[in-house]
């Protein structure tokens, strides 16, 4: 399975707009991009390790998406989380996706894939294990199960 084309377009535009703040595709779409899982996703997660990065880029990302023909609504303002999280609802026609801009730790530099920077496979898996333990949604268990048995990318 490939990343949904609408979500991929949203991710590409947002990653370019936020590029100088270290954002990379994360969450389920990162695992899909690495070929570890096959499932539909409901959101696009972009993570940066830089303090305040979501707050610093949210307006720029909104403008870039609007210029690319998307309708953009602010779902959660970065001010609600000291600049560490922002959520946008992005739509065009009948297609809609939540775009999450968040600060998150990473150990490895992102992988450069066709879509743009994507969390290193080890960091993508680690983030999903953390999500599985922390929130325990079915999709987190599906994602972690999809990574079982894969060779470690680093030692």
Residue ranges with predicted function:
Residues 1-155:
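Compositionally biased terminal segments of proteins
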């Amino acid at each position: 399975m490939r990343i949904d084309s609408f979500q991929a377009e949203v991710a590409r535009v947002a990653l370019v707009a936020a590029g100088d703040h270290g954002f990379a595709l994360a969450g389920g779409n990162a695992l899909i991009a690495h070929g570890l899982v096959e499932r539909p996703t409901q959101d696009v997660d972009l993570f940066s390790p830089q303090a305040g990065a979501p707050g610093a880029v949210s307006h720029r990302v909104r403008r870039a998406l609007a210029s690319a023909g998307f309708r953009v609504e602010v779902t959660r303002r970065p001010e609600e989380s000291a600049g560490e999280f922002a959520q946008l609802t992005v739509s065009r026609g009948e297609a809609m996706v939540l775009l999450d801009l968040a600060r998150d730790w990473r150990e490895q530099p992102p992988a450069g894939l066709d879509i743009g920077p994507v969390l290193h496979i080890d960091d993508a898996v680690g983030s999903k294990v953390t999500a599985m333990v922390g929130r325990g949604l079915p999709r987190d268990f599906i994602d972690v199960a999809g990574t079982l048995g894969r060779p470690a990318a680093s030692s």
